C-alpha cells in the first residue's frame, strides 16, 4: 500500500497533524553534505522498508540554522521527518538531542503500530548531530 493510499480517505484513523505533515511536508530536500556545517543522518527500518535521511546545518553557537529531509516510507514516517525538522530548527544541538520519539509520537498521535516511525526520526536527528560533530572535531 502506498503512503497516499494509506492516508487517503481515512480521517478517523490518523490524527489531522499526520495528514497535514504528509500532504504538506516541511523542509523536504537536501543540503550539501560536503559542507563542514552540515551533518547527515541516514536511518532505516528493514521491517517496514522506511528509509529516512535527515540533514542539519549548524551555525554560530551550535544553533541548527536549517534542516532538510528525504524519506522513503509510509505517511507516518514522512510526517515524523517533517515534524522533526520543524522542531530542531533554531534549537541548539543540546536542545535537539532532548527530542524523543515519544515527543514526536505524542504530537502526531501515532498509533502503536507506527511508533517505529518516530523512533527513526529521533535516531536520524542523533545521527545527523553525530556526523556534524565528527566532521568538526578539533585537530590534535
Curated annotation (Swiss-Prot):
Pathway(s) where this gene product acts: Cofactor biosynthesis; iron-sulfur cluster biosynthesis
Cofactor binding note from Swiss-Prot or TrEMBL: Binds 1 [2Fe-2S] cluster per subunit.
A Pfam family that the UniProt record links to this protein: NifU_N
GO BP: iron-sulfur cluster assembly
Domain of life from the UniProt record: Eukaryota
Location within or outside the cell: Mitosome matrix
UniProtKB keywords: 2Fe-2S, Iron, Iron-sulfur, Metal-binding, Mitosome
Functional summary from the UniProt entry: Scaffold protein for the de novo synthesis of iron-sulfur (Fe-S) clusters within mitosomes, which is required for maturation of both [2Fe-2S] and [4Fe-4S] proteins. First, a [2Fe-2S] cluster is transiently assembled on the scaffold protein ISU1. In a second step, the cluster is released from ISU1, transferred to a glutaredoxin, followed by the formation of [2Fe-2S] proteins, the synthesis of [4Fe-4S] clusters and their target-specific insertion into the recipient apoproteins.
Quaternary structure and interacting proteins, as annotated: Component of the core Fe-S cluster (ISC) assembly machinery.
Family: Belongs to the NifU family.
Protein name per Swiss-Prot or TrEMBL: Iron sulfur cluster assembly protein 1
Species name: Encephalitozoon cuniculi (strain GB-M1) (Microsporidian parasite)
Upper taxonomic lineage: Eukaryota, Fungi, Fungi incertae sedis, Microsporidia, Unikaryonidae
Chain's gene name: ISU1
Amino acid at each position: 500500500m502506498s503512503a497516499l493510499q494509506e492516508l487517503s480517505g481515512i480521517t478517523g484513523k490518523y490524527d489531522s497533524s499526520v495528514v497535514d505533515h504528509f500532504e504538506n511536508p516541511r523542509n523536504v530536500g537536501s543540503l550539501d553534505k560536503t559542507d563542514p556545517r552540515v551533518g547527515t543522518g541516514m536511518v532505516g527500518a528493514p521491517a517496514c522498508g522506511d528509509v529516512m535521511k535527515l540533514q542539519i546545518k549548524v551555525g554560530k553557537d551550535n544553533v541548527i540554522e536549517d534542516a532538510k529531509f528525504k524519506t522513503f516510507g509510509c505517511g507516518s514516517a514522512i510526517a515524523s521527518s517533517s515534524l522533526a525538522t520543524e522542531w530542531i530548527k533554531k534549537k541548539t544541538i543540546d536542545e535537539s538531542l532532548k527530542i524523543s520519539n515519544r515527543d514526536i509520537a505524542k504530537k502526531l498521535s501515532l498509533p502503536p503500530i507506527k511508533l517505529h516511525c518516530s523512533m527513526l526520526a529521533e535516531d536520524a536527528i542523533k545521527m545527523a548531530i553525530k556526523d556534524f560533530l565528527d566532521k568538526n572535531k578539533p585537530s590534535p
